[in-house]
């Protein structure tokens, strides 16, 4: 893909460079992999393309199953809404009915480790660790087939990181 850098004032093209070339990737159910590279090498851009956030200039992306991208702290969360309201909104966007939405919110409550007061507070007041807890809990609440994570779990405490790793291992065992 080509990435465009735009000056905020004039909206004029400052630079154009090719970020990803010759990417050919096939991942099977239950596989887990990491993308390693130097800063600026296109790792995050590749994840945004896989998530459907950025359109490739050429080639195709084929995904089968439900996709849950976690590509930054707070990305996809509405800052004015509470944690629970965000969980309900995400469940609705994923096509959950009323009982599915209730299951999602209960899953978020139990997995995130956030207090009820925290979950009833607007997300804009969350710390980075709280944001990671909420985001990961929402993203994995309905056991997605594909989970894309971009450095989000680098924040927060070691106990929650271990809990996330265990949840990912469980998803892998179930073929997700």
Residue spans for each PLM region:
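ABC ATPase nucleotide-binding domain signature region
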Residues: 29-33, 38-94
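Pre-NBD coupling/linker segments of ABC/ABC-like ATPases
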Residues: 1-22
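Helix N-cap at the start of a conserved alpha-helix in ABC-type nucleotide-binding domains
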Residues: 157-159
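ABC-type ATPase nucleotide-binding domains, specifically the catalytic core motifs of the NBD
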Residues: 5-8, 88-101, 111
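Helical segment within the ABC ATPase nucleotide-binding domain
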Residues: 161-174
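A short, proline-enriched helix->beta-strand linker immediately N-terminal to the Walker B motif
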Residues: 133, 137-149
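Conserved ABC nucleotide-binding domain
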Residues: 98-125
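Conserved A-loop
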Residues: 24-27
């Amino acid at each position: 893909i080509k990435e465009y850098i735009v000056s905020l004032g004039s909206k004029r093209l400052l630079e154009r460079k090719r970020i990803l070339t010759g990417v050919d990737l096939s991942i099977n159910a239950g596989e887990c992999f990491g993308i390693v590279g130097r800063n600026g090498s296109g790792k995050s851009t590749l994840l945004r393309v896989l998530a459907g956030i950025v359109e490739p200039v050429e080639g195709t992306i084929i995904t089968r199953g439900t996709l849950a991208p976690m590509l930054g702290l707070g990305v996809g969360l509405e800052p004015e809404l509470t944690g629970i309201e965000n969980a309900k909104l995400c469940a609705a966007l994923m096509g959950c009915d009323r009982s599915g939405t209730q299951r999602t919110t209960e899953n978020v409550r139990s997995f995130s480790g956030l207090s009820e007061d925290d979950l009833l507070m607007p997300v804009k007041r969350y710390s980075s660790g709280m944001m990671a807890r909420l985001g990961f809990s929402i993203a994995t609440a309905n056991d997605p087939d594909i989970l894309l994570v971009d450095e989000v779990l680098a924040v927060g405490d070691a106990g929650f990181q271990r809990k996330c790793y265990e949840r990912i291992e469980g998803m892998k065992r179930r073929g997700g």
